[in-house]
Amino acid sequence: MRPILLSGHERALTQVKFNPDGDLIFSVAKDQHICVWFAHNGERLGTYHGHQGAIWTVDCDPTSTIIATGSADNTIKLWEIKTGRCLHTWEFPTAVKRVEFSPDGTRLLGVTEKRMGHLGTIVVLDVKLDVDAEQNPERAMTIVCDESKATVAGWSYLAKYIIAGHEDGSVSQYDAKNGDQLHSVQIHDMGSEIRDLQWSQDRTYFITASKDKTAKLVTARDLEVLKTYPADTPLNSAVITPKKDYVILGGGQAAMDVTTTSARQGKFEARFYHKIFEDEIGRVRGHFGPLNYVAAEPNGKGYASGGEDGYVRVHQFDKGYFDFMYEVERERKNKMEQAQQ
């Protein structure tokens, strides 16, 4: 599995995203640049300029028309993908750590930082997918996190709930229509920040990655923990792969905690676990520094990882990845094939 190395950033990567078709990759980093790449060959399509601080987050709308970015310059910006034109800027009192479009692309949520006397919030903005339309500058809804600040958030199936992961290791569920908190569950160790939250393809369950060295698979409806994937290093990111029942975890010791320079020592690898059986089935090495984000290609053919080393690595899976099966999976497949005959 030879990776394509994308080198377009001078500082650590913060997020890497595929568009819904899987043919474009968007990458953002602490160097104020947003890059867009062709996924199949790693060629750079272009960059988007306008932010004045580290960019923490990016998301692409379902039609691949616009992207949203959130930055340490306290703004969320909308961009036209094709031309690189900035369509709108929303300003906030603190940095924006996460943005995500609703499944239909008409709403955008943003997670703002708790700082300088301001509480952390989750804001919801109405978005028009027409690039020439006037965007609404007002916020549709604001959820204030007065207990523990939200670090990540996303939309569940049909945009019914907003699910947020918090700094204290808890996950909470909000009604997406009025912002009422419906549910809150402490799923990770107390005080272990949730660093990432990524959805299954149908958005009925999600995976979290935490500083407590575990990733957990959780249902969106009642926040029940279905599976736990233990690692030996703090995790920054986790993703559920389409097509095959795997999850990919990324992490590594924080740069300031590393005392040895060996990449093996810092545990800077992408780890593959079986989604159902919770076993680790393989690792992919390559980054020289912690993995800050892992993203799965929507068609299940590969994945991309963004590291503290400033590189994005894009992997296309080999035949062995698709052929690999547990004994029980193979037996089930054979039984189903016999039944069809």
From Swiss-Prot:
Its main location: cytoplasm. Keywords: Cytoplasm, Initiation factor, Protein biosynthesis, Repeat, WD repeat. InterPro entries: eIF3i (IPR027525), WD40/YVTN_repeat-like_dom_sf (IPR015943), WD40_repeat_CS (IPR019775), WD40_repeat_dom_sf (IPR036322), WD40_rpt (IPR001680). Transmembrane segments: none annotated. Component of the eukaryotic translation initiation factor 3 (eIF-3) complex. It comes from Pyricularia oryzae (strain 70-15 / ATCC MYA-4617 / FGSC 8958) (Rice blast fungus). The keyword Transmembrane does not apply. SUPFAM superfamilies: WD40 repeat-like. WD repeats lie at residues 8-49, 50-91, 145-184, 189-228, 286-325. The gene is TIF34. It holds the Pfam family EIF3I. GO terms for cellular component: eukaryotic 43S preinitiation complex; eukaryotic 48S preinitiation complex; eukaryotic translation initiation factor 3 complex, eIF3e; eukaryotic translation initiation factor 3 complex, eIF3m; nuclear periphery. Gene3D superfamilies: YVTN repeat-like/Quinoprotein amine dehydrogenase (2.130.10.10). This is Eukaryotic translation initiation factor 3 subunit I.
